Amino acid sequence: MTSTAAEGAGSGSLNPPHSNPSGDGGPRIRSPPGKGNKPVALADITNTGKPNAARSITVPDLVKENTKLLTLLNEKTKIIDLSRVEIYKLRLALQASKQQNLHLTQTNSQMLAEINTGKDRIKMLQHELSCTTALLKVKDSELDRKKNAGNVQQKGVKSQVLKTKASTVAVEAHHVGDSVTSGVEHHVVESQSAVSSNTVCQEPPQDGKQKRMPQRRRSSRLNQGSCEIRGVSQNTLHENPVVPVAPSTLSLEKQYGQTTGKHMKSLQNECSATVHEVIMASEFEKTEINELPQKTDLKEIPEACSSETEVQSHKIGDKAFNSKQNHLTGSQSSLSFNTVDTPEPPEDNTVKRCSKKRSSIEDVNAKLDTITSEPLRHEEKRKSRRKISARLNSVSSEHTDIVVETEHKDVIVSLAGSTSNVSMEQRTNQEQDGDCFSRKSNENQILGRRSLRRAAEKVVSYKEMPLNVKMRRP
């Protein structure tokens, strides 16, 4: 290295000898610049410059140059070592950065996974929340429906209990009014028979068209609370001018004094007392019904109402019919034989009416005790009484019906004020209970009556007739 450096330094410091172009040891002619390897011409030979003087190369110069080169080499080696250290440091930093990058990527991936799981969990929680809100709404609606249904059931039970109470009160009041009217009618018939003992009763010609309605329908009319009796046509009244007209209540008061009015007032007071007792009994029954559980079948209530109203109405109708038959037979005997009856004093009649009133009150109390316990027994009694009333209907005659109807008109007018309210209430109650009665008619037929025998109906399906059958001659 040193030899080469010295040679380089010597060559760099000294000018090299020019080459001789002629080749005989002399200075050579330089080729003109830019001509390359052209052959030397005469101009070039003749115009040659003077050669430079050769320099002398010394040893100290070479040593100096060598030392300079050594210093440069040392510096370069130092720079190389420093660069190596720096490169190593950079490699270490790169590795550390790579590791940090890996850690960061891992943490980033973990965070992203946690975020995704959190989002999914939020979605699930939102779905659960929506489902729970929907379930709560459904439960609230069900609770509201149950509350409304319970309120409706309570209202229906209350209304039906009120209807049953009103119907029972109206029926009992009508029964009491019927008993009172029957006593008054009996008194009027006796007085009229005594007055009209000397008169002659001419029977009207019986026509086939004017047939009397059955007594059964008449008893049903009395059950409705109306004391109306089928009136006689104007023709029959004009044809029978000899038939006596029943005296009014004013004439009775004139004949027997004002004792009858007092007795009527006492009877009305007793009627109001009995009605009050019936109302108290019905309220007691209402309290017992309210103590029952609210989940009772609502279908049993209208059936019981209809059965009770049927039993009471038929029982009252049968009693009214029996009393009417007794009055009819009494009046018929008095009119047919033209016997003279002495009128009884009003005190005996009032005693009779009081006894009848007491018996009717006892019947009312007995009914209230036996209606709920023995409904089937009442139905059997009603059937037997219906049969008896049907037999009695066949025996009664038309003429006695007409006479008694004309006799009862004035008495009914006098008592219409006291029984009009009861009749109106009972009519409305029976119109409301008509539907229940129509529903229970089939069940009553199955229980007590003979079942209807219907012919088997042949079911024929429609089929198209073939053409050859259509074209046949009849």
From Swiss-Prot:
Keywords: Cell cycle, Cell division, Centromere, Chromosome, Chromosome partition, Meiosis, Nucleus. The keyword Lipid metabolism does not apply. Residues 1-53, 189-226, 322-356, 422-442 are annotated as: Disordered. Coiled coil: none annotated. Its main location: nucleus. It is found in: Nucleus; Chromosome, Centromere. Highly expressed in tissues containing meiocytes. Expressed at much lower level in leaves and pollen-containing flowers. GO terms for biological process: cell division; maintenance of meiotic sister chromatid cohesion; meiotic sister chromatid segregation. InterPro entries: SGO_plant, Shugoshin_C. Residues 211-220 have a biased composition (Basic residues). This is Shugoshin-1. It comes from Zea mays.
